[in-house]
From Swiss-Prot:
GO terms for molecular function: actin binding; alpha-tubulin binding; beta-tubulin binding; G protein-coupled receptor binding; Hsp70 protein binding; Hsp90 protein binding; ubiquitin protein ligase binding. The keyword Ion transport does not apply. PANTHER family: PARKIN COREGULATED GENE PROTEIN, PARKIN COREGULATED GENE PROTEIN PARK2 COREGULATED. Keywords: Cell projection, Cilium, Cytoplasm, Cytoskeleton, Flagellum. GO terms for biological process: flagellated sperm motility; protein localization; spermatid development. It comes from the Eukaryota. This is Parkin coregulated gene protein. It is found in: Cytoplasm, Cytoskeleton, Cilium axoneme; Cytoplasm, Cytoskeleton, Flagellum axoneme. Transmembrane segments: none annotated. Expressed in trachea multiciliated cells. It comes from Bos taurus. It holds the Pfam family ParcG.
């Protein structure tokens, strides 16, 4: 009888329950979670009740590709280039051992363009500066070499490395204005050059309220691509725009508008 009275009193006054008993009463009963089955899409397992379909793998459009040994590095280490490094108050520059105008452009210019894939000093410096020097003094020697430059340009862009792409875009802008008819000679090769530009065209850096120093250094990849496409259109002749538009659908003409 005493035990029954205690039980009744506890039922009537739940506030007098021990703390541990109260906590246990407040906790919800455990619910058994069914085991989920991860499966590939469009399979029989994917149609089962507890299956979770695995998403598609990343396409890797912006993923950097591994670099390969370049012919430029091999020739440089072998001492086959008539160049040396010269220091002055403005920084490093190339000291040419021969007159640039007398160089065999069919031999040297494609090799220097092959060095656009380089990312380490001094190879990347010699390749980049050597190209600009040769384009500055090449004149009518540049146009016949254009077909030999396309594969090195394509290889450099296909690395998908931001630094390499920016350097290559600046080289392309210089190449277009380096001699007459060069811009028009590049039009048939847009299908090999422009796909990577189409991928990275909108990859601008959003710095918010901060200062974007990449714009001052001309290293903002989206802006450089826009400048390069506009240079192609200006110097590529009447067929340039339609061919650019075919490969980069979001490009708008800088001449027609």
């Amino acid at each position: 009888m005493v035990a029954e009275k205690e039980t009744l009193s506890l039922n009537k006054c739940p506030a007098k329950l021990p703390t541990r008993t109260k906590l246990l009463a407040q906790q919800p009963l455990p619910v058994h979670q069914p085991h989920s089955l991860v499966s590939e899409g469009f399979t029989v397992k994917a149609m089962m009740k507890n299956s979770v379909v695995r998403g598609p793998p990343s396409a890797g459009a912006f993923k950097e590709r591994p670099t390969k040994p370049t012919a430029f590095r091999k020739f440089y280490e072998r001492g086959d280039f008539p160049i040396a490094l010269e220091h002055d108050s403005k920084g490093n520059k190339i000291a040419w051992k021969v007159e640039i105008e007398k160089l065999d452009y069919h031999h040297y210019l494609p090799l220097f363009f092959d060095g656009l894939c380089e990312m380490t000093f001094p190879y990347e410096f010699f390749a980049r500066q050597g190209i600009h020097d040769m384009l500055e003094h090449g004149g009518n020697k540049i146009l016949p070499v254009i077909p030999q430059l396309i594969i090195p340009i394509k290889n450099a862009l296909n690395l998908r490395n931001r630094q390499v792409i920016c350097v290559t875009l600046k080289v392309l802008q210089h190449l277009v204005v380096s001699a007459e008819m060069v811009g028009e000679a590049l039009v048939p090769y847009y299908r090999q050059i422009l796909p990577i530009l189409n991928i990275f065209k909108n990859k601008n850096v959003n710095s918010g309220d901060g200062i974007d120093y990449s714009q001052q250094k001309r290293e903002n990849i989206g802006d450089l691509i826009q400048e390069t496409l506009e240079a192609f259109e200006r110097y590529g002749g009447e067929d340039a725009f339609i061919n650019i538009k075919y490969m980069v659908p979001t490009y708008e003409s800088c001449l027609l508008n």
